[in-house]
């Protein structure tokens, strides 16, 4: 938004639409981003027909982006507080790949002095689990780290397993990092509660119409 150079309202809207098209051309179908871009396009359309009243469209657009950022921050904060209630003192908590919502849950548990331990797992192809390992360690949580082949070895003894989500459908299907399904099966085998930490930005409204959720494929 800070790169917008146009000064006339119509030109500003055209420039915003151009940026949205550029992002859509190169991004994988990550739902929170898609929802963000949809709100940007709604802003330009409302401005074009006059339902969005503003003297400075560029400033109004920046305010919209800040509003969205604040909404997302509030959602993550609430997830952290609700999720940490599930954790008791000295529980072992397992997680897979990288999730800001899951990390917020762990941060809250540490802040509440619950002295937890953790098990984290590597996720391919981008090795997101290494980032999770670093972030958990920085919280001062003792953590055991392994690849997905060690799920059956390291998950037993955990009180719960948390993952984030890429998308959630109207039928309750959860799309997450490859390997999450294996983790769910292991938890089912050992009777360990398995939780998905996500807010409504991960819900795909097109699934209400029967459209399948697009798989977010990433190159190895």
List each model region and its residues.
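Long amphipathic alpha-helical segments
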Residues: 1-60
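Predominant activation on well-ordered alpha-helical scaffold segments within soluble catalytic domains
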Residues: 1-2, 17-20, 34-41, 81-84, ...
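Short, glycine-rich nucleotide/cofactor-binding loops
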Residues: 4, 92-98, 170-176
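Gly/Ser/Thr-rich loops at beta-strand to alpha-helix junctions
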Residues: 29, 92-93, 97-103, 125-126
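Short glycine/proline- and acidic residue-enriched helix-loop micro-motifs
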Residues: 62-70
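A short, well-structured juxtamembrane/interface segment
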Residues: 71-88
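Nucleotide donor/acceptor-binding cores
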Residues: 90-91, 116
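Conserved phosphate- and dinucleotide-binding cores of soluble alpha/beta proteins
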Residues: 104, 111-115, 121-220
């Amino acid at each position: 938004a800070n790169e917008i150079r146009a000064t006339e309202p119509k030109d500003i809207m055209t420039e915003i639409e151009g940026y949205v098209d550029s992002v859509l051309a190169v991004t994988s179908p990550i739902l929170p981003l898609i929802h963000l871009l949809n709100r940007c396009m709604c802003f330009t359309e409302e401005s074009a027909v006059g339902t969005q009243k503003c003297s400075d469209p560029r400033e109004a657009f920046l305010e919209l982006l800040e509003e969205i950022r604040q909404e997302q921050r509030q959602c993550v904060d609430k997830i952290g507080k609700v999720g940490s209630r599930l954790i008791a003192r000295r529980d072992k908590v397992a997680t897979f790949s990288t999730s800001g919502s899951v990390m917020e849950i762990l941060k809250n548990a540490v802040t509440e002095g619950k002295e937890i331990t953790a098990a984290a797992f590597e996720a391919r192809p981008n090795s997101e689990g290494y980032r999770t390992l670093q972030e958990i360690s920085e919280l001062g949580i003792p953590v055991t780290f392994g690849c997905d082949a060690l799920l059956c070895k390291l998950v037993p003894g955990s009180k719960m397993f948390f993952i984030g989500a890429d998308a959630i459908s109207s039928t309750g299907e959860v799309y997450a990092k490859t390997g999450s399904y294996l983790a769910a099966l292991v938890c089912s085998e050992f009777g360990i509660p398995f939780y998905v930490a996500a807010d409504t930005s991960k819900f795909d409204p097109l699934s209400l119409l029967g459209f399948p959720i697009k798989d977010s494929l990433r190159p190895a």
